[in-house]
Design a protein with these regions (language model features):
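Catalytic loop of short-chain dehydrogenase/reductase
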Residues: 91-113, 132-188, 196-211
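C-terminal helical subdomain
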Residues: 211-249, 254-264, 268, 272-275
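Conserved active-site helix of classical SDR/Rossmann-fold NAD(P)-dependent CH-OH oxidoreductases
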Residues: 23, 121, 172-179, 183, ...
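Canonical Rossmann dinucleotide-binding motif of NAD(H)/NADP(H)-dependent dehydrogenases/reductases
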Residues: 2-33
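The beta1-alpha1 cofactor-binding region of Rossmann-like NAD(H)/NADP(H)-dependent oxidoreductases
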Residues: 39-40, 59-74
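A glycine-rich helix->loop->beta "capping" turn
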Residues: 52-55, 75-88, 94, 103-104
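Conserved glycine-rich Rossmann-like NAD(P)H-binding loop of the short-chain dehydrogenase/reductase
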Residues: 28-44
Length: 283
């Protein structure tokens, strides 16, 4: 288990699973950077943690903007120096039925692909330096059992769109990225894993879809903590978990050609935000 006085960044930590994970990490003695878009909601989580004897700080960024993702990472690097855990939890679900309303991000990408995949991929890459300084360190990507291959010729889903399909594609991409990054960081002291925490937890994301919840947030927290601070997350890397158990992601996420093509497209989209900008964000 990770020791006290280490720092974790949890994205999407103002509600649902992310909020509960932030509290659990603080309860284990970690300093938690509570990410959100809304200052009041983030402050509420920080207040809740500090009143319970934990240490936390709010950090704000809209993950639909890759520039804001870069600024968040640059601030963490400059202000914290070293961190030991990144939990890429923030995400957008399928939406409300009939799931037909497509939205684009600030950068013109399909919104779920941007927030659920491009943002965590960029954040993880830009935080490699402080994670190496904090090693042994971990990256935990919150995925889903719902995964579908990405149509690289139609990333914005101009030809056919449903929120559910967009969500599944984003989680496919995140799993494939997890495996790629784990290979790249082998031997660095950073483990990278992905998990489906629990099926249809009682969260706003699930309730919005009008599907009855099937499991509790507490069940999901237990699975996340297994990889975030427990034994599994420190001994394996490049793996996919379904709850507490190692499992197999979509077969396509293991295909070398598929991953190579996705990696190339992702690199092209993220390259402008991976270059050093000379700017530091203030939080």
């Amino acid at each position: 288990m990770m020791t006290a006085a280490t720092t974790a960044l949890v994205t999407g930590a103002t509600a649902g699973l992310g909020r509960a994970v932030a509290g659990a990490l603080a309860g284990q003695g970690m300093r938690v950077l509570v990410h959100g878009r809304d200052a009041k909601r983030a402050a509420s989580v920080v207040d809740e943690i500090t009143k319970s004897g934990g240490a936390a700080r709010a950090v704000l960024a809209d993950l639909a903007s890759l520039q804001q993702v870069r600024e968040l990472a640059d601030w963490v690097n400059a202000d914290q120096g070293a961190i030991t855990l990144l939990v890429n939890n923030a995400g957008i679900g399928a939406g409300r039925p009939p799931y037909r309303k497509r939205q684009l991000s600030a950068d013109g990408h399909e919104l779920r692909f941007a927030v659920n995949y491009l943002a965590p991929a960029l954040l993880a890459r830009r935080l490699v330096p402080p994670l190496k300084k904090g090693a042994p360190a971990r990256i935990v990507n919150i995925g889903s059992v719902g995964q579908a291959p990405v149509d690289l010729a139609d990333l914005r889903m101009d030809n056919h769109y449903t929120g559910a399909e967009a969500y599944y594609r984003s989680k496919f991409a995140l799993a494939a990225f997890t495996f790629d990054l784990a290979e790249e960081l082998a031997g660095s002291g950073i483990t990278v894993n992905c998990l489906h925490p629990a099926s249809l937890m009682n969260t706003h994301m699930v309730r919005e879809s009008l599907i009855p919840p099937m499991s509790s947030v507490a069940t999901g927290v237990k699975a996340v903590m297994n990889l975030a601070t427990g034994p599994d997350g420190g001994t394996v890397t490049g793996r996919y978990f379904d709850g507490m158990n190692e499992a197999r992601a979509h077969p396509g996420t293991y295909d070398p050609v598929t991953r190579s093509r996705l990696r190339a497209v992702t690199a092209e989209l993220l390259d402008p935000f991976l270059r050093d900008s000379g700017r530091q964000a203030s939080r």
